[in-house]
Amino acid sequence: MSRSSPDQLTRFLAQVQGRPKKGLSQNFLIDGNILRKILAVSCVEAGDWVLEIGPGFGALTEVLVNQGAHVVALEKDPMFEETLKQLPIDLEITDACKYPLSQLEEKGWQGKGRVVANLPYHITTPLLTKLFLEVPNQWKTVTVMMQDEVARRITAQPGGKEYGSLTIFLQFFADVRYAFKVSPGCFFPKPQVSSAVVHMTVKETFPLETSLHQKFFSLTRAAFGQRRKLLANALKDLYPKELVFSALNQLNFSEKTRPETLSLNEYLQLFHLLSSNA
């Protein structure tokens, strides 16, 4: 019987006298069709190595293993340690937010891997940020389940209220695609929100050299930190307002431009202009 079976999960929880922990965002996938769709979207092939964060009872883990992937799983809850050890995976009982991802290569995981995970929703943003800040060149693809609201934010287009610094951050590193929506009924227990799967194809080369990443993201964070402000006002602690006005004019934007107006490429152009004239 598959680990996506509700009966199997219920039986396991009864055996260990456990229950899903709300504080760890434990909502377990119990829909085999959704698992197969995640696998198809992820592009995982036999022989790939895959990082899974928060495997829980192991429904997605099992699907990845059956596909022939070599799975590295980071699970915080020791309740699942013994059952996950029954699968042929490299398991770490650890807090993924604190786990040094550079250790993966040190432990022998050579070449680019993939990330496939049903992310704990309360730490989705920190985990996505960590993946690309710590080891951006480690990944071929990142395929993750998250809250639908967050999925729409990170796949938003310029001009909308959902578009923000996280959108730009992820699009800097990857081509980001909203794959499909997942209803609450596909989980146990049912979450109070809809979910979605997002697929990211990581770029071979990034728009800026590594030494400039933090400076660029400081600009975009400042821009969206007070999104009701004009862009020049939002950046006043980083650059003189007149310098921002001049750069915007060179890009054919008005002085009244707001942060959500600029695309990733336009923010990169703005950054180059501001850096060269600062």
From Swiss-Prot:
InterPro entries: KsgA/Erm, rRNA_Ade_diMease-like_C, rRNA_Ade_Mease_Trfase_CS, rRNA_Ade_methylase_Trfase_N, rRNA_adenine_dimethylase, SAM-dependent_MTases_sf. Specifically dimethylates two adjacent adenosines (A1518 and A1519) in the loop of a conserved hairpin near the 3'-end of 16S rRNA in the 30S particle. May play a critical role in biogenesis of 30S subunits. This is Ribosomal RNA small subunit methyltransferase A. It comes from the Bacteria. It comes from Chlamydia caviae (strain ATCC VR-813 / DSM 19441 / 03DC25 / GPIC) (Chlamydophila caviae). Its main location: cytoplasm. The gene is rsmA. NCBIfam families: ksgA. SMART domains: rADc. PANTHER family: DIMETHYLADENOSINE TRANSFERASE, DIMETHYLADENOSINE TRANSFERASE-RELATED. GO terms for molecular function: 16S rRNA (adenine(1518)-N(6)/adenine(1519)-N(6))-dimethyltransferase activity; RNA binding.
